[in-house]
Amino acid sequence: MSVSNEENFALTQVKMAGIKKKLNAESWNDEYENAITEWGEKASGLRFMHANSSGYWRGLSNKLTLYSIIATTIASAASLVAGSIDDVDSKDAVLFAAGGVGLFTSFIQSLKKFYNADEKAAEHGSIAKQFGSYYRYVSIQMGMSREDRRPSDELFEWALKDYERLQQEALPLRGADIELYKKTFKKF
């Protein structure tokens, strides 16, 4: 019984795959695993805190927008009502009130612009998703056997660079976000 070249090639490929897996497994050590796992766990916590911060800024933006809409509606209604008032003093009082409400509306809009709440909400939400994606990928890789993971040097380099990139791109967190994280996960 002779073995064809194709069969020899297939057997060689299977043996090479086994050798590659063995070499890959030997490239891993506990220090690499611990460092990568720790970065993944930190990324998970940062995802939680940035998602919470995104919700805070989105809520603030929505409140300021609603207050502005309500105040503008009141000022507009007062201006319309003032047109139908015959008494000059009453008309002036209504117009001054409408002007005051208009000033209040301008103040609310200035606050919204100053805090830039919409942009902060979007940036915190985006970085939260990126930290979540990082955590999922690290969890998947570290959940595999040493033979089936990406090579240790490749995964370590990627994990370090991506974690540092995310840290650099992330907006600062509020103290309330950090406190909520500590309170929520105090038993861990």
Question: What are the functions of these language-model segments?
Answer:
Residues 2-70, 81, 94, 108-188:
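Conserved non-transmembrane functional hotspots
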Residues 73-76, 100-111:
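Single-pass alpha-helical transmembrane signal-anchor segments
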Residues 78, 85, 102, 159-160:
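Short alpha-helix boundary/capping motifs
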Residues 88-101:
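Hydrophobic alpha-helical transmembrane segments
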Residues 71-90:
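Juxtamembrane "helix exit" motif at the C-terminal ends of alpha-helical transmembrane segments
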